[in-house]
Structures are given as C-alpha cells and as structure tokens.
C-alpha cells in the first residue's frame, strides 16, 4: 500500500491492484487495460520471459530478486526449531498459489519446479488473505513466499523461516509498454 502515498490531494489518480498469473499481467499491459504490471517468475525462466517481453514490445525492469522463505503458524513446532530442512515438511500440507503458470512450458514441468516434490497434501488458494488465514488456523500447513513484512506476519500469527535445501531464486519484474 506504499504506492498510495504517491496519490496527492487534488490530483486525479486511480490504482488497480490485482493478483493474477504472469500471462494475464502481460496481456493486460499489452491490451492497454493497465499501464504497468509486475510479473514474478523463477529465475530459471528468465530467458523465456525476456524474449516474451521483447516480442510483446514491453520494457522490463527488475525490481526485486529473492529466494522464497517458508511461512507457518507461530504455534507450529517447526517455528521453534533452530534449523528447518525440507525433510521436516514431509507430513505437512503445502498451501499453494493456485496458478503457477508459464506459457509454452508444459504444466507438469511448471508444477514440478514450483511445488515441493515430496509433499503429498496441498491446498490451492488464489487469494493471499485466505492463504494467510489458512496458515494461521490449520495445523501443519506451510507456504513458500517472497519476503513478508513483520507487521503482516504478526497480524496472522505467522513466522517466516529459511529452509535448508530450498534456495530457488525468483524475480519480480516491472513491465510497461515501450510507446
């Protein structure tokens, strides 16, 4: 919500905040539904997205690079361990964003690269607030996330942890039309 500070009294402004998949974001900017978009992707797909942005005549600027952390309930036993590794999550339920999508890459390959391979139980949820409510209230759930502000974690009773063996790199890229 920091962007709302840019809205000055007496100056007209409208912001639309929508969570969606990368292709919907790209198409919305190309169709001029929106002037800007932010696309998140795993760094291993960077060439694909760079070529796509070029093909769609979009300019892109990296605004963040990060590794996902895990969030869980502050009351979960893992929240109090000195060190957490991937094996600790085997009996847990993974809360996942419901649309891990990379166009022209087979869906099975995207799922393999985005989902924790040895976890057998998942809840797919699109909306961030619902994800956080589930994590705070359903025992033995976890989710991979970009860095989350402490105030938001506190609001939902969550903690953010680094997990050994989970070092996938991601990028958030601002896109806009070249014209």
Spell out what each predicted region is.
Residues 1, 40-42, 74, 97-101, ...:
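Structural motif
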Residues 1-50:
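Central regulatory/effector-binding core of bacterial HTH transcription factors
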Residues 2-5, 45-47, 86-115:
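Secondary-structure junction motif
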Residues 14-17, 57-60, 94, 122, ...:
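Conserved beta-strand scaffold positions in the cores of enzyme catalytic domains, especially
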Residues 20-25, 29-35, 39-40, 99-160:
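Hydrophobic hinge/microswitch elements
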Residues 32-33, 66, 81, 91-92, ...:
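Structured helix-beta-strand junction loops
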């Amino acid at each position: 919500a920091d962007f709302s500070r840019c809205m000055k009294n007496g100056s007209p402004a409208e912001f639309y905040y929508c969570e969606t998949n990368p292709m919907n974001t790209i198409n919305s900017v190309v169709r001029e539904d929106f002037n800007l978009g932010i696309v998140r992707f795993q760094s291993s797909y960077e060439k694909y997205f760079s070529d796509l942005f070029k093909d769609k005549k979009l300019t892109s600027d990296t605004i963040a690079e990060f590794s996902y952390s895990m969030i869980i309930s502050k009351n979960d036993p893992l929240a109090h361990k000195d060190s957490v590794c991937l094996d600790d999550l085997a009996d847990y339920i993974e809360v996942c964003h419901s649309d891990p999508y990379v166009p022209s890459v087979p869906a099975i390959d995207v799922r393999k690269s985005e989902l924790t391979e040895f976890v057998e139980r998942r809840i797919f949820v699109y909306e961030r607030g619902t994800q956080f409510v589930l994590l705070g209230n359903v025992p033995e759930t976890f989710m991979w996330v970009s860095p989350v502000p402490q105030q938001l974690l506190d609001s939902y009773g969550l903690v953010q942890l680094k997990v050994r063996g989970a070092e996938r790199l991601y990028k958030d890229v601002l896109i806009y039309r070249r014209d």
